[in-house]
A protein has these predicted regions:
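Peri-transmembrane interface segments
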Residues: 38, 42, 220-275, 284-286, ...
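Hydrophobic secondary-structure segments that place a key small or acidic residue at a functional site
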Residues: 86-87, 98-109, 120-196
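Hydrophobic alpha-helical transmembrane segments of multi-pass inner-membrane transport and secretion
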Residues: 13-40, 255-291, 314-323, 363-366
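Transmembrane alpha-helical interface segments in multi-pass membrane proteins
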Residues: 282, 290-336, 355, 363, ...
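Small-residue transmembrane helix packing/gating motifs
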Residues: 55, 82, 91, 169-223
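Conserved transmembrane alpha-helices of multi-pass membrane proteins
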Residues: 339-370, 377, 382-388
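N-terminal Sec/SRP start-transfer signal
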Residues: 1-31, 310, 382, 388
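Hydrophobic, regular-secondary-structure patches
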Residues: 26-105, 122-133, 145, 202, ...
Length: 388
């Protein structure tokens, strides 16, 4: 207890220096936690994928469509227990220059799509209303909050991929089964899109963007992928079949350079934390060389001296880490508010908190190592001679 009191008094002896060190630690920890949160948010879609879903897309590029006729053929592939399809629509909603107005707009088959994605929970009465109305849409709960959508609202979108003015009536609002589920999407009837294309652009009708497969056993996925891709190898629209995780990961990999840069920045921050803390502890230990010599003279052991140095380092590190972690949550919240659809799932993960705490504690231990060894090796007479 006496040593703890001395640790506290030593830390507060130079209040300004201690406060600035704690502040520097807090800023570094906040930056570390924020960057880690950005990286995990960027990859959130990968962790939310299912182990029993596969995606069939065009072998050349995701933007190229596949014939609607493939559906019946895919249903007959052994090991496939369910098939659905979807089509990227996009378009422009309100001001396209505002990130908040960018959210996925996808044409789907209501009956099969939501059966394959049970993580999208839609109230039964709303789902029935959605199925009855051909130009109806389902929006995510987060999207509804951000845009102020309510049941019965009309969402007007100016088409770009599919030109024209498109109106969708909000008939249902889905919520995710957990915090990893994307609640920022808008789904509408594929038939609404296809029927209008048949009237206005017949050459573009009868195609879908990609197929979603539900498989009976994940172990069968490699065989199913080979079977499907070999079947369409010489067709005009070849396929690339992959697991949902691989499909999602392919989009994340497009930003790999950014993610690697952010990860590297987080490592640099660890070095900053160490330098800031080590500088303070070294200065404090050097100033107290005489005091340590006197303490040794009156009977304090080397362990007591080590406790004073290490204790001060850990006290400053813990305070800085606590403040930094407390600031990480509002920083992550600001990111989610500023880019609600670009980062649909923003959570400060437990692993991020543990890493930040671990970094702070390791930095404290390393920062205290050299001054502790120096205090051990300094003889009493040499310490007393340091006066002046």
């Amino acid at each position: 207890m006496f040593v703890l009191k001395l640790v506290l008094k030593n830390a507060l002896r130079h209040k300004l220096r201690t406060i600035l060190t704690i502040l520097g630690m807090a800023i570094a920890i906040t930056a570390f936690g924020f960057i880690r949160t950005v990286v995990t948010a960027w990859s959130a879609g990968v962790s939310a994928t299912s182990d029993n879903r596969m995606i069939v897309r065009h072998s050349v590029s995701f933007i190229l469509p596949l014939p609607f006729a493939y559906r019946d053929q895919l249903e007959r592939v052994p090991g496939v227990s369910g098939v659905s399809y979807a089509n990227w629509f996009q378009g422009q909603y309100k001001d396209p220059g505002d990130w908040k107005n960018f959210f996925p707009r996808i044409a789907v088959d209501p009956e099969t799509y939501f059966a394959l994605y049970p993580e999208f929970i839609v109230p039964p009465d709303q789902f029935e209303a959605f199925k009855r109305d051909r130009n109806a849409c389902v929006v995510g709960a987060k999207l509804a909050r951000d845009q102020g959508f309510t049941i019965g609202d009309v969402v007007t979108v100016e088409g770009d991929i599919y030109p024209g003015r498109w109106e969708f009536v909000v008939r249902a609002i889905y919520r995710g089964k957990d915090d990893k589920t994307d609640e920022t999407q808008l789904f509408f009837h594929y038939n609404y899109l296809d029927e209008r294309l048949r009237q206005e652009m017949p050459g573009r009708a009868g195609y879908v963007g990609w197929y979603i497969l539900k498989v009976a056993s994940p172990s069968e996925m490699p065989r199913i992928a080979r079977t499907i891709d070999d079947s369409y190898l010489n067709s005009r629209a070849g396929t690339k079949t992959e697991t949902e995780r691989e499909f999602t990961q392919s989009f994340v990999s497009l930003s790999s350079a950014i993610l690697e840069s952010l990860t590297a920045a987080s490592y640099v921050i660890i070095g900053v934390i160490l330098i800031v803390l080590a500088n303070t502890i070294l200065m404090s230990a050097r100033e107290r060389t005489v005091e340590y010599a006197i303490l040794k003279t009156i009977g304090f052991s080397r362990l007591h001296i080590a406790g004073l140095i290490i204790g001060e380092a850990f006290l400053i590190a813990i305070l800085g880490c606590t403040i930094g972690l407390a600031l990480t949550f509002p920083a992550a919240g600001a990111l989610a508010r500023q880019f609600p659809t670009f980062f649909p799932v923003v959570n400060v993960e437990v692993l991020t908190l543990l890493l930040a705490i671990g970094v702070a504690l390791i930095a404290a231990g390393v920062a205290a190592l050299f001054p502790t060894v120096r205090a051990f090796r300094t003889r009493i007479v040499d310490g007393l001679r340091a006066v002046g």
